[in-house]
Amino acid sequence: MNPFHDLEPGPEVPEVVYALIEIPKGSRNKYELDKKTGLIKLDRVLYSPFHYPVDYGIIPQTWYDDDDPFDIMVIMREPTYPGVLIEARPIGLFKMIDSGDKDYKVLAVPVEDPYFNDWKDISDVPKAFLDEIAHFFQRYKELQGKEIIVEGWENAEKAKQEILRAIELYKEKFKK
């Protein structure tokens, strides 16, 4: 089984999507799902002394403008592991440009954690935490000499629109 191609994007798209975790919160290791084999591989260790502030992964059967699966960040109270599948509720969209390419990311919360039951939109997330995420992405490739431009945050509705678009891009790319 290849989770990227064989899993659906989610049980109730776009309200609830699957987040296939590649990188757990707190890690400096950047793992990626190998799109061909479906295995998790070590892409690199971050050059900067930063740690991912969220669980980070992809939404299965999606494709995005950066020529990769659509990224998703899941706010977790405790980190999970590479390969874990989380039912996640999109609450916002992080907009950034990575080396000239549009590289937007969905921000979500786990459906199965009652702590986040009232988190429905980006406005429910503390500004200090949003700033921490933005700071991480603004700086995490700095020692590699790569430029990241943070464009800011959008609401849950915009995130859901982009998820639906990413599903269509996947269908076009992989003729599904």
Curated annotation (Swiss-Prot):
Localization: Cytoplasm
This protein's name: Inorganic pyrophosphatase
Gene that encodes the chain: ppa
Pfam families: Pyrophosphatase (PF00719)
Cofactor requirement: Mg(2+)
Residue numbers binding Mg(2+) 2: D71
Record-stated family: Belongs to the PPase family.
Superkingdom per UniProt: Archaea
UniProt-annotated binding residues for substrate: K30, R44, Y56, Y140
Reaction(s) the record says it catalyses: diphosphate + H2O = 2 phosphate + H(+)
Gene3D superfamilies, A to Z: Inorganic pyrophosphatase (3.90.80.10)
Source species taxonomy: Archaea, Methanobacteriati, Methanobacteriota, Thermococci, Thermococcales
Main location: cytoplasm
Gene Ontology, cellular component aspect: cytoplasm
UniProt-listed GO biological process terms: phosphate-containing compound metabolic process
Organism: Thermococcus litoralis (strain ATCC 51850 / DSM 5473 / JCM 8560 / NS-C)
Binding site for Mg(2+) 1: D66, D71, D103
